[in-house]
């Protein structure tokens, strides 16, 4: 645990992500819980060589480099899986409210157990399909899932407040995917005014094939 704590602390310091000692401890505990639950439920790939604390936890925290989560802000984590990126960001920003949604009941059960074990009071896990979310809107929507950007934008358009933002963690070449999402503005009222991408490899070479996509309404 100490090795992971020092590794994560060094990465956060190196990349200008402010993190308290208590948050560091919780983030490392979450990584351990994620590893344990992943033996029971398929939450993240079991074939990866990079440690969970880097590949999944620190990867999620990189969103804080481009978005300033504010007290009272409401955030939806769409297709959260094992709580990524929602739980790490909820630990980092305890005054921001997070709702984690996934259509797979076993994954949400794991998230609920981890949230309870960590004592987090600013995050809720909900077993639901995104189409079933009614009467709620958010300041920010996050997603780490592999769904096409056009599909994520369609879901987000009705769930975001005015001037809301969709932030996705994605991999590979996204030029065609982004172009399709932007072109869809002509077909779908409410699609984002702009879509930008930030190659995370510019932040840290270990994520050379990863990108953050930001869609602004």
Swiss-Prot record:
Keyword field: Cytoplasm, Methyltransferase, rRNA processing, S-adenosyl-L-methionine, Transferase
Residues noted as binding S-adenosyl-L-methionine in the record, renumbered to the chain: 79, 84, 102-104, 130-131, 144
Principal EC category: transferase
GO molecular function: rRNA (guanine-N7-)-methyltransferase activity
InterPro entries hit by this protein: rRNA_ssu_MeTfrase_G (IPR003682), SAM-dependent_MTases_sf (IPR029063)
EC number: 2.1.1.-
Top-rank taxon: Bacteria
Subcellular location: Cytoplasm
The keyword rRNA processing is annotated on this UniProt entry: yes
Family listed: Belongs to the methyltransferase superfamily. RNA methyltransferase RsmG family.
HAMAP family in UniProt: 16SrRNA_methyltr_G (MF_00074)
Record's function text: Specifically methylates the N7 position of a guanine in 16S rRNA.
Protein name, UniProt field: Ribosomal RNA small subunit methyltransferase G
Organism, scientific name: Chlorobaculum tepidum (strain ATCC 49652 / DSM 12025 / NBRC 103806 / TLS) (Chlorobium tepidum)
